[in-house]
Amino acid sequence: MLLITLNENTLSLSPGSQVIFPHQTWEDYERLLSLRLQKTYPKLYFNRKTQEIRLMSPLPSHGNRVDTLRDLVKIILRRQGKDWQCFDPITLKMLGEAGLEPDTCFYIDNRQAILGKERIDLTVDPPPDLAIEV
């Protein structure tokens, strides 16, 4: 059963649900992000070309699949002798164009550029080398 709560103070979506809002703007996306406060769910995606905002609230088992893929990438990177910086949760925004929240992302080649940062700003920071969305 889909249960969505959306008012001027709250944004929530029942686990396993997805909702798409057509005809939306970047300002609408930013407003929804602010309603979510510091929570990581529901995940929010915006695409200016489609003018859609997508809200997604994964099931608890979703995290297990993300953990497995993240661990697999780490094993491969260790075997290759590469250093990395992993970010999750993270909101990646290209101002006015797109906003997305991958399940996890890795900075490998661009690791040095973001070391010590708690937030990524794509207007000055490079994008992740690898983003995983399950």
Q: Which role does the model predict for each range below?
A:
Residues 1-134:
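Gly/Pro/Ser/Thr-rich low-complexity, intrinsically disordered segments predominantly at protein N-termini
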